[in-house]
């Protein structure tokens, strides 16, 4: 049995409560869907700055009524201490996907990018700490590996950094 199958069995056996930030984004919405299909409780937090309501609507069709009831969505912002505290309440694990992820955008609007990607991340960490969350998983960007063409990219070999 592969590790992913073991993890799926463990999650089904012992459900947990998860917070997915950036829940309306491409990756976030797929994480929400997968967790709900594994009968987990999920809180989604998103401000729709880059994610879309359609991503959340699309996942509904693959879920049972019971699974849909296990999802609570908060339209809020990771830069808001109040929103982060509310989202982290009662959560076991945080999957932090929320970010403004475009290198060109970061040059065009460095303050908004910094606020979301740095201050927002810190707000999530502080709220998670106060809520006694067991673990926060942070999603980085493949841009940190630079423009290396060979896949898979490896940490020890980088091209010209993109961010």
Model-assigned labels for residue ranges:
Residues 1-163:
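N-terminal Rossmann-like NAD(P)+-binding domain of SDR-like oxidoreductases, especially those catalyzing
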């Amino acid at each position: 049995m592969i590790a992913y199958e073991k993890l799926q069995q463990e999650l089904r056996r012992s459900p947990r409560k998860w917070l997915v930030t950036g829940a309306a984004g491409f990756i976030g919405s797929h994480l929400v869907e997968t967790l709900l299909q594994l009968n987990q409780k999920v809180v989604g937090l998103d401000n729709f700055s880059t994610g879309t309501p359609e991503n959340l609507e699309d996942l509904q069709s693959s879920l049972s009524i019971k699974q849909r009831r296990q999802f609570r969505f908060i339209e809020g912002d990771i830069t808001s201490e109040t929103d982060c505290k509310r989202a982290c309440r009662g959560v076991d694990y945080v999957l932090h996907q929320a970010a403004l992820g475009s290198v060109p955008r970061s040059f065009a609007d460095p303050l908004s990018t910094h606020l979301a990607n740095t201050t927002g991340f810190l707000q999530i960490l502080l709220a998670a700490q106060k809520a006694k969350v067991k673990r926060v998983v942070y999603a980085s960007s493949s841009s940190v590996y630079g423009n290396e063409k060979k896949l898979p990219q490896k940490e020890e070999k980088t091209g010209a950094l993109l961010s």
